[in-house]
Each structure stands twice: as C-alpha cells, then as structure tokens.
C-alpha cells in the first residue's frame, strides 16, 4: 500500500488549478504612446482654441462639457480625475484602451457604447487636453458652510 490518505478508496491524479484571474492594476497613465506629458501652470490659449475646434467637430455628438452623460461621459472634471497621459492615450489609442485598461473598461460598462476611433493625432490630442484643462471647474466658496464669528461681517451671507 503506497497511499497515506483517508480511506475513501478514491484516487485523485488531478492537480489543483486556480481559476481566478489575476487582478490587473490600472496604470494611471493608460496604455499608449504617451508616457509623459509636459503641462505648464497656465493655459496655452492657442493650443486650447485648436482643441476646442476638434472637440466641436469630433466629440460633442457624444460628450458634453458638463458632468452629464450623453452617449459618453461628460467632460467636466476629467482633468481632475485622470492623468494627462491617460486622457491623451484614450483619445489616440481608444481601441487598445477599451480592450485593456480597467478604467476605460469601467466607462464602457457604464456607457454601453464603444468610443469610436476618431484618428486624432498626438498634437491634436494635446490641444483637446489643453481645452479640457481650460474648462476645469474653479473651486467655489460655499458660504452656507462658513461660520462668521464677527457680527460686523454677517452681511456677507
């Protein structure tokens, strides 16, 4: 007798296989040619204007500049939620991003429609990014949550 197992009488020649998928960690820069994008402090108005023209021509049929979903998600706040490289990779490499990037796949799951490849070049994608940066919402004061301890300043509310 060469077995040391329990007395069930059944033999097992199978090996234990793990069927769970390895969790893929999303690269915050996405997948594509853009690994590093230089962004200045201010807005390049010329670049933003060229980006606006492209957005008006190729993007507004599906995307709005607010936070509302049309076909695709609204653009509001995108530059706060995503890295510049991710945005540019999504614009220029949309098919690979939708197939392999977990963040892009989550958007596809939410919107249920694949973003079409618009054949946007790297320089044009940079213009779109600059336009989206220009549209970034400014932080606003919420005076309802501010407590003013000086009675002479209560007129502010």
Predicted features and spans:
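C-terminal motif of bacterial Sec signal peptides marking the signal peptidase cleavage site
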Residues: 2-3
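Gly/Gly-Pro-rich "capping" loops immediately C-terminal to redox-active cysteine motifs
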Residues: 48, 52, 63-93
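Electrostatic cytochrome c docking/interface patches
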Residues: 16-54, 155-156
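C-terminal capping alpha-helices of c-type cytochrome domains
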Residues: 85-90, 113-150
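Bacterial Sec signal peptide processing site at the extreme N-terminus
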Residues: 6-18
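Axial heme c-ligation environment in periplasmic c-type cytochrome domains
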Residues: 6, 70-78, 95-124, 140-141
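Sec/Tat-exported extracytoplasmic proteins
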Residues: 58, 63-66, 79, 91-95, ...
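Sequence context of c-type cytochrome heme-c attachment sites
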Residues: 35, 64, 105-106
